[in-house]
Structure formats: structure tokens, C-alpha cells
Regions:
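ATP phosphate-binding glycine-rich loop and adjacent ATP-lid/helix-beta elements
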Residues: 125-152
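Conserved short strand/loop->alpha-helix "switch" segment adjacent to the catalytic nucleotide/phosphoryl-transfer site
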Residues: 55-86, 90-100
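Acidic ATP/Mg2+-coordinating residue in the GHKL
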Residues: 118
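Glycine-rich nucleotide-binding loop
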Residues: 100, 122, 154-160
Length: 164
């Protein structure tokens, strides 16, 4: 009988969470009449609650401001991105005092914007990306959403994603 090491367990848990994020899209679509677009605020709120339940320990407040309507195809990629960024913040950004994660959504002239910011300990955003999660976020943003991502580290980490 083979046992997973810690890395394997972590990867499996993250894959399970990504699958649950896609399931959340289906739940929201069943509750509404328009099945081609959905409220990002509702979806990300449900998703953030689900992710938070998986991380006990310190208290983290997750707030969502604004709303945009996104196509189902975009929602799948955005859900995985939110999952990765929120999970990273929950795992690495905060000490025993907890903290806050803010997700801001807006759209101007067809350009959508999603900001995910935490008030945690931060890291060097200019260093080469070595984590699978952040590499996935960058790849999905650029290749699938045909957008861009920028990150800054001041009083925590802020990721700003833009796409059409």
C-alpha cells in the first residue's frame, strides 16, 4: 500500500478544490435563468467560503467588492485563478493574528478587472515564479483569458488581472 507524501497530498487537495470550483459554477447556473453568463461576485463569494472552510486556524476575512458578469468559459479559468490566489494567501500570508483578503471586480469599456489583495507578509514579486500555483495563474490569465497580470508587494500582495 503506497502512501502519498506531503507534496502529493497538497497537490491532490488543490486538484479537488479546483474541481469543486467548477461545481460551484453549475450550482449558480441552476439558480438563475441566464445560463451563458454569471455573477462573478456570487461565484467568487461561494468559492471563497468553500476554500476558507478547508483552512482552519487563524481568522481571515474575505471581502468582495463590485461585480461583473462573466461568460461560463471565463468563469472556469477565473475560478481556478481565485482558488490559487486565495489558497496561497491563506497558506502563506498570515500569522496567528489572521488578516484580510480583498477581491475587487470592475468593468470599463469591455475591459474586465479583478484585483486580489491581502494584507499579509508579502514576498518578492520580482523573483522568478517557482510555484506551480502562481505559474498556473499567469498561464491561465495570459493564454486562456488573453489578459495580463501584474503583482505588487506593499502591505501584503496585490494581483491585478485584466482581460476583455
Amino acid at each position: 500500500k503506497k502512501h502519498l507524501d506531503e507534496t502529493g497530498k497538497t497537490m491532490l487537495a488543490e486538484a479537488e478544490q479546483n474541481i469543486r470550483s467548477i461545481g460551484k459554477i453549475h450550482e449558480i447556473l441552476y439558480r438563475q435563468q441566464n445560463i451563458s453568463r454569471l455573477s462573478a461576485k456570487e461565484y467568487f463569494g461561494d468559492l471563497a467560503d468553500e476554500i476558507k472552510r478547508g483552512y482552519s486556524g487563524h481568522f481571515v476575512d474575505i471581502r468582495i467588492e463590485g461585480d461583473i458578469q462573466i461568460a461560463v468559459e471565463q468563469a472556469i479559468y477565473c475560478g481556478i485563478i481565485i482558488n490559487e490566489l486565495v489558497t496561497n494567501a491563506l497558506k502563506y500570508a498570515f500569522d496567528e493574528n489572521g488578516g484580510r483578503i480583498d477581491i475587487k471586480l470592475s468593468e470599463t469599456g469591455g475591459q474586465k478587472s479583478m484585483t486580489v489583495a491581502d494584507n499579509g507578509r508579502g514576498y518578492d514579486v520580482d523573483a522568478p515564479i517557482t510555484s506551480f500555483g502562481l505559474s498556473l495563474v499567469q498561464k491561465l490569465t495570459e493564454d486562456e483569458l488573453k489578459g495580463s497580470i501584474s503583482s505588487t508587494s506593499k502591505d501584503g500582495i496585490t494581483h491585478i488581472l485584466r482581460w476583455s
